């Protein structure tokens, strides 16, 4: 290698020199990197004939032992990848700034760049490289660019070659295993026992040679690994692994934490409590103050909370690096308040809320005595949880919290916790509080702008076109700069999520240009921004989620945010966006996210061979290599969390895509084989989907009864009886598995929400199938009371809507549902739910038409149509109602609206028929809708004197009212009766020999006018 010639390896050394000076690098890594750079520079200067080192050998043999693999994957390979010749020129220009610095003094002060000494070894090398580069002509630049490209291509090809070799080796191992299947069971058991014994002995021998620090790191990684197996492996197998670690490393304190998480995961309260006490007995008082400051770890575990239905893994915890604030240097009982806080969390998880509150009071008392503000901030968070309606109303002795509820609320305590965690610079807790605040707004529907002005933007008001804030305040100010109130002509675009699902959360003054990207595939399901107060509500919901993601960029926080977005869009009625964010949550889940070794660069073999995740390339060969690498990584990926699986299955069921839902459930059962021992989430999901499927079958059988003969009708009736029996069993099972003491951090989610969902399913079954209106009303009243008492105000809208439909179906009490319709409408307006508002408005429009208030009906129709532009069924119903209101005034417009209604309905029906999974939830209602359309058209054309169209739509109406099969049966019966009469008459003629005049029986007439529509005619 010529020392006077620029090579790709020299360019790589220059990249590392620049990173050595100004990169984020630890001291010991910086020292090792300097030795590596100096050695390679000397080799380039004194060994001209040595062949240049390849990139793969350089990384595999030297660089990966100096710098972390994560840096090599995410930054280093991008640094040495140049997309054009201009990129090489810009890089060389940046090398000159290493000696003199940049002209921008502000950037120098902010970044604190370190200059390179021109007389040092590194400085002399960089100067030679710059000198050689300045002497290169344009043809030489092209050649250097091609060499760099080939330099990277060789690296990719080497990775691909190693992958193929490993795959071949794995295939050979599989073949050898297949050949040894003939071994007897006794020999296999003996061999397995011997292997287990050898593994344990080797395991213990290897662990004995670990240093204390390595032991802690090893147990930390084992904690994460074993915790990710809960619900997947059998409890006995996990327990054996935990016992093996205890026997090997009995003095390592975190071993007992593994046992604690294991017992929490499998819902063993007594053993969890014992392990918690044992864990803190080992931890307490065994570390000096210097050890605490050096380790920077409190060993405190708090729930990685999921605010929709609980976390996918009930014992998924993260460790926070909090600085302990104490008045004295005494380390005795240093961990006592945190031990009590963990006791609070343990009682809360198992639904023992009284014990949890008493333990929280003790933790607050100890923290106040020691002036431990970090512990008090955590206590505020847990106090806000205990003050929730769903918690304190579940207590058997709720008088414990009466004095607190008289002066405080959960939202006030939560705001206080947000302020305290911001002041103490606790970003993890601050992110957790923001997501809790977002969930509170989502459930209760309350909003105010004070939280934005007092908490979010207290330090972020930029005037006179200033876009930068001071970096010397705290971590939260750094992250909240994305939410600044920019004055005096600032252009503010705030993209808060993927795929156009954006919710802008900035309040801009004085001619700001807000680009609000609230569209979602042009399917917004009804103008949420039409309402004046909706901006503040959704600003309070979506803005805290984005702040939490800025504060904590871990995959667990991203998964929580995606589930909250999914719940919000599902509440709005947009199931497509809810499914989209659920799939994002599945992609962002990593059970080993807390691992110190967490990296997409995973070892693919026991020989420490690494697969690198490469960025974009310029060559097709590179793209093929990347695709193969991604496929290998996808095969090695961990399965998504159970919560995302179940939620996606429920969304498919809600859209009547049962085949997809069943496939997801089958995959869940194949992965989470022991999940039934951890909780009831998977069982609840299966029963809910089974209930929906049985309801569809009953509707299909009822519709088929009108199109089949008597034998088929009997079969359908028998099938309905079987389905109704199964539904009753499913309802009993759903009620049995619900538990009001299920905490929101449990794998099953909040218990009261599941109970309310069960009530809604039972009400729909009693009302739509069985016609049991009294039972339905009793359950509705009970469901409304539960929703009010336990903080589920968003569910009250559905109950009032169901109650108004019950009154609508019972004709004597039809106008009694007006108050319930208005209640559902007001609640839907307060929550800005477009579909619920449309349903309530349709019920109110029908009442207006029944009382001849046509002007109010037309006005309400015009207000409702923009809300449901994407829902063809609701659009069809609204146009039908509009046509009814115009029959007496304008027949042409009425026919026009009837044509629109028919066209929308037929489009919806054709889309459903093309889909293999037809949505038949409203088949009976749809038939009634089409029947009314044909009936009204036949009446209007009759009044206009258009006999042809009148007969056409009368036949269509008759075909729906009396199916063709039943008409054919009637005709056959009439023919048989006529033949019998003719035979009888012939017999009489032969006996009496007297003429008899045959009497002609009139055919039965079919009424074309239902009694409901007589008044409109």
Swiss-Prot record:
Instruction: State where the protein is found.
Output: Nucleus
> Which windows of the sequence hold TPR repeats?
30-63, 182-214, 252-286, 337-370, 508-541, 642-675, 756-790, 838-871, 876-908, 931-964
- Record's compositionally biased regions (Low complexity): 451-525
Q: Key word Ubl conjugation present in the record? A: no
UniProt GO cellular component terms:
anaphase-promoting complex
Matching entries from InterPro entries are given as: Apc5, Apc5_dom
What is the protein name given in its UniProt record? Anaphase-promoting complex subunit 5
> What organism is recorded for this protein?
Dictyostelium discoideum
Instruction: Name the gene.
Output: anapc5
């Amino acid at each position: 290698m010529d020392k006077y010639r620029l090579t790709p390896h020299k360019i790589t050394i220059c990249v590392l020199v620049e990173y050595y000076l100004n990169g984020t690098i630890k001291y010991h890594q910086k020292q090792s990197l300097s030795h590596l750079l100096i050695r390679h520079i000397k080799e380039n200067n004194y060994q001209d004939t040595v062949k240049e080192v390849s990139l793969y050998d350089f990384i595999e043999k030297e660089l990966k032992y100096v710098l972390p693999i994560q840096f090599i994957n995410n930054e280093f390979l991008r640094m040495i990848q140049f997309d054009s010749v201009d990129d090489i020129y810009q890089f060389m220009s940046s090398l000159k700034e290493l000696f003199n610095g940049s002209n921008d003094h502000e950037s120098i002060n902010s970044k604190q760049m370190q200059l390179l000494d021109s007389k040092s070894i590194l400085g002399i090398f960089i100067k030679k490289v710059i000198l050689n580069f300045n002497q290169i002509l344009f043809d030489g630049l092209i050649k250097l660019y091609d060499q760099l490209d080939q330099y990277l291509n060789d690296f990719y090809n080497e990775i691909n070659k190693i992958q193929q070799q490993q795959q071949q080796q794995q295939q050979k191992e599989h073949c050898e295993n297949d050949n040894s299947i003939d071994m007897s069971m006794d020999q296999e058991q003996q061999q397995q026992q011997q292997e287990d014994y050898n593994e344990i002995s080797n395991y213990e021998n290897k662990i004995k040679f670990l240093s204390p620090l390595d032991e802690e790191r090893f147990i930390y990684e084992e904690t994460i690994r074993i915790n990710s197996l809960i619900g997947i492996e059998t409890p006995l197998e996990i327990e054996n692994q935990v016992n093996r670690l205890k026997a090997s490393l009995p003095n390592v304190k975190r071993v007992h934490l593994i046992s604690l998480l294991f017992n929490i995961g499998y819902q063993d309260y007594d053993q969890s409590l014992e392990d918690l006490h044992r864990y803190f007995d080992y931890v307490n008082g065994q570390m000096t103050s210097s050890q605490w400051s050096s380790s920077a770890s409190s060993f405190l575990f708090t729930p990685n909370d999921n605010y929709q239905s609980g976390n996918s893994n009930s014992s998924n915890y993260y460790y926070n690096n909090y600085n302990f604030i104490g008045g004295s240097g005494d380390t005795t009982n240093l961990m006592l308040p945190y031990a009590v806080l963990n006791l609070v969390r343990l009682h809360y998880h198992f639904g023992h809320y009284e014990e949890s509150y008493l333990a929280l009071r003790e933790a607050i008392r100890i923290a106040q005595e020691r002036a431990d503000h970090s512990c008090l901030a955590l206590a505020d968070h847990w106090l806000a949880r205990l003050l929730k309606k769903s918690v304190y109303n579940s207590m058997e002795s709720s008088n414990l919290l009466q004095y607190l509820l008289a002066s405080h609320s959960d939202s006030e305590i939560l705001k206080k916790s947000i302020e305290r965690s911001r002041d103490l610079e606790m970003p993890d807790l601050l992110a957790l509080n923001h997501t809790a605040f977002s969930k509170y707004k989502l459930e209760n529907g309350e909003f105010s702008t004070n939280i934005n002005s007092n908490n979010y933007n207290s330090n972020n008001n930029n005037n006179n076109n200033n876009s930068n804030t001071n970096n010397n305040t705290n971590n939260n100010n750094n992250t909240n700069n994305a939410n600044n109130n920019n004055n005096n002509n600032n252009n503010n675009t705030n993209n808060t999520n993927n795929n156009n699902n954006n919710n802008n959360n900035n309040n801009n003054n004085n001619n700001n240009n807000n680009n609000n990207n609230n569209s979602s595939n042009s399917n917004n399901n009804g103008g949420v921004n039409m309402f004046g107060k909706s901006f503040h509500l959704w600003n309070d919901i979506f803005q805290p989620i984005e702040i939490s993601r800025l504060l904590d960029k871990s995959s667990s926080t991203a998964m929580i945010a995606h589930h909250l977005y999914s719940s919000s869009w599902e509440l709005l009625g947009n199931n497509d966006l809810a499914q989209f964010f659920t799939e994002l949550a599945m992609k962002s889940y990593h059970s080993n996210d807390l691992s110190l070794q967490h990296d997409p660069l995973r070892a693919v073999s026991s020989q420490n061979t690494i697969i690198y995740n490469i960025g974009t390339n310029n060559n097709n060969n590179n793209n093929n290599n990347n695709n193969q690498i991604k496929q290998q990584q996808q095969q090695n990926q961990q399965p998504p969390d159970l919560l995302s699986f179940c939620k996606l299955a429920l969304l498919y069921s809600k859209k009547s895509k049962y085949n997809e839902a069943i496939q997801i459930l089958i995959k869940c059962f194949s992965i989470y084989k022991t999940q039934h021992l951890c909780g009831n989430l998977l069982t609840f999901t299966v029963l809910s989907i089974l209930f929906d499927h049985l309801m569809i079958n009953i509707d299909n059988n009822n519709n088929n009864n009108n199109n089949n003969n008597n034998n088929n009708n009997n079969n359908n009736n028998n099938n309905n009886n079987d389905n109704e029996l199964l539904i009753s069993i499913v309802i009993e099972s759903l009620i049995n598995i619900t538990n009001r003491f299920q905490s929101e951090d449990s794998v099953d989610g909040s218990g009261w929400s599941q109970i309310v969902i069960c009530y809604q399913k039972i009400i729909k079954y009693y009302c739509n199938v069985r016609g049991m209106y009294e039972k339905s009303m009793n359950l509705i009243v009970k469901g409304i009371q539960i929703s009010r008492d336990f903080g589920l105000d968003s569910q009250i809208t559905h109950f009032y809507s169901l109650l108004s439909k019950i009154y609508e179906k019972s004709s004597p009490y039809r106008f009694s549902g007006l108050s319930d319709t208005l209640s559902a409408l007001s609640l839907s307006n307060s929550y800005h739910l477009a579909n619920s508002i449309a349903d309530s408005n349709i019920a109110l429009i029908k009442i207006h038409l029944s009382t001849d208030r046509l002007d109010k009906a037309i006005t309400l129709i015009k207000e409702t149509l923009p809300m449901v532009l994407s829902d063809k069924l609701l659009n069809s119903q609204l146009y039908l109602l509009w046509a009814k209101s115009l029959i007496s005034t304008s027949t042409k417009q009425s026919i026009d609206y009837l044509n629109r209604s028919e066209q929308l309905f037929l489009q919806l029906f054709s889309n459903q028929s093309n889909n293999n999974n037809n949505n038949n939830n409203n088949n009976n209602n749809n038939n009634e809708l089409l029947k009314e359309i044909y009936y009204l058209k036949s009446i209007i054309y009759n009044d206009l004197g258009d006999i042809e169209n009148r007969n056409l739509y009368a036949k269509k109406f008759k075909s729906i009212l009396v199916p063709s099969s039943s008409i054919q049966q009637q005709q056959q019966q009439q023919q048989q009766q006529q033949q019998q009469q003719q035979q009888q008459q012939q017999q009489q003629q032969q006996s009496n020999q007297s003429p008899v005049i045959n009497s002609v029986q009139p055919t039965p007439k079919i009424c074309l006018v239902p009694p409901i529509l007589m008044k409109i005619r």
